[in-house]
Amino acid sequence: HQANARIVESLSQRLDIPLDKFFCNLDKYGNTSAASIPIAFDEATKASIFKQGELGLFVAFGAGLTWSAILVRF
């Protein structure tokens, strides 16, 4: 989840993916824990950020080094 902006920025740098490719809503809601991906997905969909045929990667990680990811083609 988007616990803080530093995590998103670090991931952007480590994966060499431009920060503008990340959808971040921390400034609006803060840390929403497990709800962060569904909330961000809903906002991005309503804003028509995803284009048909594009890939979207949703990654979540939390305590105990647990993580999960899903790759979606729109």
What function would you assign to each model-found segment?
Residues 1-74:
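Claisen-condensing/thiolase-fold acyl-transfer catalytic domains that form or cleave C-C bonds
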